[in-house]
Amino acid sequence: MMKLTIRKKVLFCSLIPLLLLGGIILLIASTIVKGAIIDQVENSLKGTAIATQAAYDQNAGTYLQTENGDIWKGSYNISQSENLVDTIKQESGMEVTFFYGSQRIMTSAVDKNGDRILGSPAGDKVVEKVLNGGEGYFSDNVSMDGIIYYGYYVPVYQKGDNTTPIGMVFAGAEKQEISHSVIQIINTIVAIVLVVLVICI
């Protein structure tokens, strides 16, 4: 009976450091994994936004707004570029949007009725960073029709004038889908840590 009690005490004393070590490993691994995934998301969104901007920018001429409100790049009507944004979405899995100034002119994103989400303005922070500051901007809290996205914005300039942006291009991915992927990876890490702990015990 005495030997059994001592054995339990030894087991208990050895179990505490193992559990602490497992918890620390889990915390560090989860933080690293989440950070790495978010960095990858940002880089992917940035790449898609830049590629979309280049697709519009390859058309000769300047960006301008006609009397009926349509936005053109030379002889190319951006306000009717549904095929372009839908193709980019199909190939990349990301939503893309062209802003003229702060207004959403063309987008692949649709609302619950299947209508494109057009005319809504960008947020103040986006305007400050991209239109006023001329910077690329990554956000983890972009809302479109009640859905939260990770998003990246790049400024759009007239050809030969990099002083004042005339608009922006946005690329976004649903935050919930990415969070689900992160949770799946973390759950896998938890399972591995638990298996290792059981083996050690």
Give the role of each language-model region.
Residues S30-A54, Q184-T188:
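Juxtamembrane membrane-water interface segments immediately C-terminal to a transmembrane helix
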Residues N43, G47-N59, L84-M106, G136:
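Short N-terminal helix-loop-first-beta-strand/juxtamembrane motif that initiates sensory/input modules
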Residues A173-V193:
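Membrane-interface helix-start motif
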